[in-house]
């Protein structure tokens, strides 16, 4: 890693917390009762998307910026693309659950948008830091 953990500020690693919180929140929503016709594909695929986002963020954060810049950028971009897929998937399964409140759906949308903005900002700052070292 480019910055030792003990020297990091909270804002540098906040996206990891957001990704893990999103994963847990999606898992808790998926534990609600959904209709059987959408259970297998909808629930499993939605959970896979949330897990992939968290895994990509954790893996990308473990890479050194200057050594693995391309791999790190690819993983962050993949996480952003998976966030887009997750938001589409959640909009599809929304009609199949009546136990999840509108407030929970709104919180989920805000969490997805915030994480997407965090990841875009990280990609931008990584590019600036990488170009500065060249």
Predicted regions and their residues:
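Amphipathic alpha-helical assembly/interaction segments
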Residues: 1-134
């Amino acid at each position: 890693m480019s910055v030792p953990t003990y020297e990091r500020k909270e804002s540098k690693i906040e996206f990891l917390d957001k990704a893990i919180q999103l994963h847990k929140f999606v898992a808790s929503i998926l534990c609600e009762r959904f209709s059987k016709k959408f259970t297998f594909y909808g629930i499993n695929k939605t959970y896979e998307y949330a897990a992939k986002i968290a895994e990509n963020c954790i893996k990308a954060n473990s890479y050194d910026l200057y050594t693995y810049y391309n791999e790190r950028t690819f993983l962050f971009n993949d996480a952003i693309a998976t966030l887009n897929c997750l938001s589409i998937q959640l909009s599809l399964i929304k009609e199949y659950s009546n136990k999840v409140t509108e407030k929970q759906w709104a919180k989920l949308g805000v969490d997805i948008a915030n994480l997407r903005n965090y990841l875009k900002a990280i990609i931008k700052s990584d590019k600036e830091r990488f170009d500065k070292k060249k």
